[in-house]
Amino acid sequence: MEFSQYDDNNNLSLTKFESMLKTNNVLFFDSNEFENIIHHYLDNGKIALAKKAIKLGLEQHPTSTNLKLFRIEVHVFENKLDLADELLNALYEIEPSNEEVFIQKANIFSKQDNHEKAIQTLQKALELSEETSDLYSLIGMEYLFLDKFEEAKSSFMKCLETDNEDYSALYNIIYCFDFLEQNKEAIDYLNTYIDSNPYCQVAWHQIGKQYFSLKDYNKALTSFDFAIISDEVFIGAYLEKGKVLEKLSRYEEAIENYKITLALDDPTSFALLRIGKCYEK
């Protein structure tokens, strides 16, 4: 489902809805307003309010597919899987080409630990959808549940090809490489990614960690430097750079980097411990 960005009108709708709940008056909202209100409540974990909005929304707009899908989504969240499945089957009869029906169906299969069936269902959704990034991500997660790391990696790569700023997908790709102990392959992949995204601090940070695992400390150091150039308040890069400098016996420089992390955020026990170890050496 597509949702409009929250703006003044959305905030007014939310205020209007919450004011209505405090009175006995029932006000009219168009279906898009209900969708944004429900989306807001679900995003903020306010399930009871979301359910009230869904109930009233369907009373005012009984044929709204998106509101029906929200109702199903809440049933799945509450593990009312049989009821959700029954409602989905009824919706499928009306809209057999709606990819959201397949996504929610896959969600049910996943909750039932039937991950292979979830993948097959998500692949059907792929055939119907123009927006594929989130679907590839969902498929990747199902493969992770099955410990099929090569397949998961491939799915997350497709996700990143569709949206090259999806850092969650990038982290998942590296997780798969790490589990498969494919450090060199990970470096090759990250280098290709960096060619198109030269100022991506996440990629530089990850490539530095790969070099660190291979004990190529000089290349790791260069990578963390580039991560810091890309984002000079990236605490993780300073911590990793400090670890590399320790390996190179450059303890004073390591201390400097650990101290930077203390200035950027609340002190971590790791940074304080490493500073103490460096002073000992």
What are these regions (language model features)?
Residues 43, 77, 111, 145, ...:
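Register position in tetratricopeptide repeats
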Residues 57, 90-91, 124-125, 158-159, ...:
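Canonical positions in the second alpha-helix
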Residues 60, 93-95, 128-129, 162-163, ...:
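Structural marker of alpha-solenoid helical repeat scaffolds
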